[in-house]
A protein has these predicted regions:
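N-terminal amphipathic alpha-helix/helix-capping segment at the start of soluble metabolic enzymes
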Residues: 1-20, 83
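Active-site-adjacent beta->alpha loops and helix N-cap segments on the catalytic face
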Residues: 1-4, 53-62, 71-81, 103-108, ...
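Glycine-rich beta-to-alpha transition loops that act as phosphate-gripper elements at the mouths
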Residues: 22-27, 96-105, 128-129, 150-154, ...
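Hydrophobic faces of well-ordered beta-strands that scaffold small-molecule active sites
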Residues: 17-21, 46-48, 93-97, 122-124, ...
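Catalytic cores of alpha/beta
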Residues: 31-37, 155-163, 215-231
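Glycine-rich phosphate-binding active-site loops on the catalytic face of alpha/beta enzymes
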Residues: 48-53, 121-123, 128, 171-180, ...
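Alpha/beta catalytic cores of nucleotide-metabolism and tRNA/nucleoside-modifying enzymes
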Residues: 194-207, 216-289
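Alpha-helix-loop-beta-strand connector modules within alpha/beta enzyme cores
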Residues: 59-94, 138-147, 151, 188-206, ...
Length: 289
């Protein structure tokens, strides 16, 4: 489902917009309203975040929201409600979760429940393909997409293994450290996308490469959309919620970002762009949104 939605965006001469929001901030109902608002503003795919007590790869903005959800006892059943809401709103829902909550819930059980709720798959930022046997088997059985991450520090062997194991898209993390919005979009992301596409071609698949981390406005979205198949935005959406702008703020941000990915243009989507040349280089190895 995810690959088809990105295919559809590319047929329109643009990258896909992928929004991330966690369930449970400021409460479950308000977070689901905001998630749906992201779709109404133009998001093609929504990453629905699972609250976790030790989100080591998340920056302070996302951690602040997730901490509230964890203290309130928000869990995977609430996440599945959000999945249903996104599917009903016409976007493609994927869950983004650290691996521990999925193991505790039961890998096969979660795969079944996610599929039944209309979910397309899952992004697992702290799970590498080598250690994902149970999830690979469960996702094969249910037809769910499984999205693994690569970073500028990834070796060619790691890129190849990730390209071979992923389904839906490959998540290219453009900077190192924890997640959060950036003032500029560095050129490390473009280099990583090119390397990942080479790995995908070598293993004989046709996966898309989507870039996460750092984008906070439509202009930055246009920069990333010039060389990526999808633009992933997380912290900027969460900031709208933390600052009290709620669903209306999320909807407006989505509209700005959606306009940005459309500005990149079909010709730039076809090949790597040099539009970010000269901007400060990103650090190496960050994962998240």
């Amino acid at each position: 489902m995810v690959q088809q939605r990105i295919d559809s965006a590319r047929s329109e001469g643009r990258a896909a917009l992928i929004a991330y929001l966690p369930v449970g901030y400021p409460d479950v109902d308000a977070s689901i309203e905001a998630i749906v608002a992201a779709v109404e503003g133009g998001a093609d795919v929504v990453e629905i975040g699972v609250p976790y007590s030790d989100p080591g790869m998340d920056g302070p903005v996302i951690q602040q929201a997730v901490d509230v959800a964890v203290r309130a006892g928000v869990g995977l059943r609430d996440v599945l409600r959000a999945v249903e809401a996104v599917a009903a709103a016409g976007a493609v829902p994927v869950v983004m979760s650290y691996w521990n909550p999925i193991e505790r819930y039961g890998v096969d059980r979660f795969a079944d429940d996610l599929s039944a709720a209309g979910g397309a798959g899952m992004i697992t930022p702290d799970l590498i393909p080598d250690e994902a046997g149970a999830w690979l088997a469960a996702s094969d059985r249910t037809g769910l997409d499984r999205v693994f991450l690569v970073a500028p520090s990834s070796t060619d062997a790691r890129l190849a293994a990730t390209a071979a194991a992923s389904r839906g898209f490959v998540y290219a993390a453009s900077t190192m450290g924890v997640t959060g919005t950036r003032a500029t979009v560095g050129d490390a992301a473009e280099r990583l996308v090119a390397r990942t596409r080479e790995a995908i071609a070598d293993v004989g698949t046709d996966l898309h490469v989507c870039v996460g981390l750092g984008v906070s406005n439509g202009d930055q979205a246009a920069e990333v959309a010039a060389f990526a198949d999808g633009v992933i935005v997380g912290s900027a959406y969460v900031r709208e919620m933390l600052d009290g702008r709620g669903a209306d703020g999320v909807r407006a941000l989505s509209a700005d970002l959606a306009a940005g990915v459309r500005r990149a243009g079909a010709s730039e989507l076809a090949s790597s762009s040099s539009r970010t040349a000269g901007l400060p280089s990103a650090s190496v190895g960050e994962v998240g949104a």
